[in-house]
Structure formats: structure tokens, C-alpha cells
């Protein structure tokens, strides 16, 4: 894939936002928000209250505490932004969980987003200056602890490395790789199985505050971009449709919000001029100052994003037959002023012996949306 510096610069606008008088919520490394498993993606990006397989490491690591006596590995692949028809723009997620008697279930994951080969050119001509590859990667581990029969807590630790335009310059500033470390904190509550209309049912509720950590610095100055610290909470309802539990459905709903802010810092040069740089609010500070509106530049004008507009909503339905065949559907929504992603999702899964395969498909409401026709494929292996 070969893209000129104009496309690179357009992407880096997210890293070097226009300065406004209000705090803004632009974050670095948004690849950490990509829902990694085809099951949750097929259910409208839901999973914080389900978290019953290896991908609990992403959705809710507390879910590991309820997964006793089972081991699993999974890999997900997606040709990201398929509408761009670019072969080396892809996303991979590898995850595994392992149960240790007397300790519990632990897990590890690797997330990789390849952005392909870039070409830096002069502003006044197509002559190449340099070529480089852009990619982002995260590596982490998780653990869930069962506090009681129905309640568990969990945590993850991950290392993050982002190499977008290393060695190039943007606005006379040299761009370096960025790195950081992040923590997730979560809980999951499951009711006892109860009877509903003569059928077994269960309700669960969970929350996960992910990517808690210091901002990433790409340039030599003090500018830092916040991590996509995300608060996700939701519920799930499981119901057997017959006495034997052969037919089963799950309804799920996730609500999430970015808990991050950048703020301007002003310094005075020796000649009296004032320089302004954007610095990420600390993760604890952002938990308190993210509950208000913020302003951002949409390319043409400055717009205000209200608090309710900052929430992202996903809802999904899953049907299982004999724990072997699954069908899924869902809906995902973001406000037009805050991401503007709205689409329906479809998915299916099959389980046979120790193997499982899931896939999901995104049907955007706009035919030319970058996420249109995005497919994810996941392979699961129990051992």
C-alpha cells in the first residue's frame, strides 16, 4: 500500500488536534477500542456482561474468574476498512486463557494493527522523501478473581507501542514512536439461575474501565495524547427456550464512553511569544473532568459535543442450537458529532469438539462508510 504524505497528514490530525478554548477528547492508539472477537462484534459490539470465553480479556477480565477448568486459545483476523481495498491494512488479535488449580484463570493477549507502507513526499511535488511502515501493537495479561459465588473482579495490564510516522516531521516536529502502559479494572455479577415461565434464565451485569494509563508522546516537545480510556457497562439476559436447553437465546446491551481529555498548556518564550501545546489529562483527573461537554474541530467549524452525545450504545441478540450452531445480530450507534458510526451487525458460529469458528459482518447505513462490509473471522481452540 502506498499513500502520499497528504493522507498521512490527514491521519495525524488526530494526534495533533486544533487548539480550542475547551478541553477536547481526542485520543491516541484508537486501535485499542476495536472489538476483537467475531462473537461480540456480531452482537452489536456487546460483551461486557457475557465475557465467557478467552476474549473476556478485552470485554471484561472479571469473566475469567467464572471460567474454571477450561483452557482456550483464539485468533481473530480482519482486513480492516475493507472498503478501501488495501491489502496490507489489517487487524489481528491473539488471546489465550489457562486455568491453574488453586490460583484461578489467567490470560494473555496480543493486539496488532498493520497500517501498511507509507510514502513521505515533498509538499510541492510527488518526489518521495522516505518510505516507512506504520503499525501499532499491544501485549498484555489478565486475571479474574471470584469474590463470591455470584461476583468477580478482574484486571489487565498491557504494554502499548505505536509507530505511525517514525522519523518524519509534522509541523517542524520530529515524530517518534510512542509507548505507554495501561491497566483495566472490571467487575462482573451473575445471578443464580432462576425459573422464568418454566425455563432456566440468568441475568448478568458488568463494567470495565479499560486503558487506564499515561498519555502517549510522539514528538520531542511536551505534547501528549491521552489513551482511549473507556468506561463500558452493560447487562445480558440468558434464557433457555426449552426444558433441555437445546435452544437458547442471549440479549445484551453495552453502553460505553471515552474517559479522556486533553488540555492546553501555555508557555512563554524568551521573546515574549506564547506557545501552546496539548497535554493529556491524567487518567484519574479524566475520570472526573470527562462528565461535561467538549469542543472539537470537524474540519470546517468548531462544534460542541454534549455529555449525552458522548455515549456509545450497542445491543445484540444471540441464538444457540445444541451449543453447536449460533446466529447473531446487533445494532451499534454513535452520535453524528462523536464518531458518527451507526450500523447493524450479523454473525454466526459453529462448535465441534474442541474447535470453534465465528464470523461477523458490518452493514453500515451509509454505503460509502469506511467500515462498510467489514468481516471478522475468529478461530477458537479448547485444550
Predicted regions and their residues:
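Repetitive helical segments and hydrophobic/amphipathic motifs
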Residues: 11-12, 69
Amino acid at each position: 500500500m502506498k499513500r502520499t504524505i497528504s493522507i498521512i497528514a490527514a491521519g495525524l490530525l488526530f494526534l495533533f488536534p486544533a487548539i480550542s478554548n475547551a478541553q477536547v477528547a481526542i485520543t491516541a492508539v484508537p486501535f485499542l477500542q476495536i472489538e476483537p472477537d467475531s462473537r461480540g462484534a456480531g452482537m452489536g459490539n456487546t460483551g461486557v456482561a457475557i465475557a465467557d470465553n478467552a476474549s473476556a480479556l478485552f470485554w471484561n477480565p472479571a469473566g475469567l474468574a467464572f471460567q474454571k477448568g477450561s483452557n482456550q486459545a483464539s485468533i481473530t483476523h480482519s482486513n480492516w476498512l475493507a472498503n478501501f481495498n488495501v491489502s496490507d491494512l489489517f487487524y489481528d488479535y491473539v488471546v489465550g486463557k489457562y486455568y491453574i488449580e488453586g490460583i484461578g484463570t489467567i490470560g494473555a493477549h496480543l493486539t496488532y494493527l498493520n497500517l501498511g507502507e507509507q510514502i513521505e513526499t515533498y509538499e510541492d511535488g510527488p518526489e518521495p522523501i522516505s518510505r516507512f511502515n506504520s503499525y501499532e501493537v499491544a501485549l498484555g495479561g489478565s486475571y479474574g478473581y471470584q469474590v463470591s459465588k455470584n461476583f468477580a473482579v478482574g484486571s489487565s495490564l498491557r504494554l502499548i507501542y505505536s509507530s505511525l510516522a517514525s522519523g518524519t516531521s509534522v509541523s517542524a516536529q520530529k515524530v517518534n514512536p510512542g509507548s505507554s502502559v495501561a491497566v483495566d479494572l472490571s467487575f462482573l455479577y451473575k445471578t443464580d439461575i432462576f425459573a422464568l415461565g418454566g425455563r432456566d434464565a440468568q441475568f448478568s451485569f458488568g463494567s470495565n474501565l479499560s486503558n487506564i494509563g499515561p498519555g502517549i508522546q510522539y514528538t520531542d516537545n511536551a505534547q501528549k495524547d491521552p489513551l482511549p480510556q473507556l468506561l463500558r457497562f452493560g447487562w445480558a439476559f440468558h434464557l433457555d427456550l426449552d426444558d433441555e436447553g437445546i435452544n437458547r437465546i442471549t440479549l445484551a446491551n453495552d453502553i460505553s464512553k471515552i474517559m479522556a481529555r486533553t488540555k492546553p498548556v501555555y508557555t512563554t518564550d524568551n521573546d515574549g511569544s506564547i506557545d501552546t501545546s496539548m497535554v493529556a489529562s491524567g487518567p484519574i483527573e479524566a475520570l472526573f473532568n470527562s462528565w461535561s461537554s467538549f469542543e472539537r474541530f470537524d474540519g470546517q467549524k468548531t462544534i460542541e459535543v454534549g455529555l449525552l452525545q458522548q455515549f456509545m450504545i450497542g445491543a445484540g441478540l444471540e441464538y444457540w442450537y445444541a451449543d453447536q450452531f449460533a446466529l447473531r445480530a446487533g445494532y451499534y450507534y454513535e452520535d453524528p458529532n462523536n464518531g458518527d458510526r451507526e450500523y447493524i451487525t450479523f454473525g454466526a458460529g459453529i462448535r465441534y469438539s474442541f474447535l470453534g469458528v465465528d464470523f461477523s459482518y458490518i452493514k453500515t447505513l451509509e454505503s460509502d462508510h469506511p467500515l462498510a462490509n467489514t468481516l471478522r473471522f475468529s478461530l477458537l481452540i479448547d485444550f
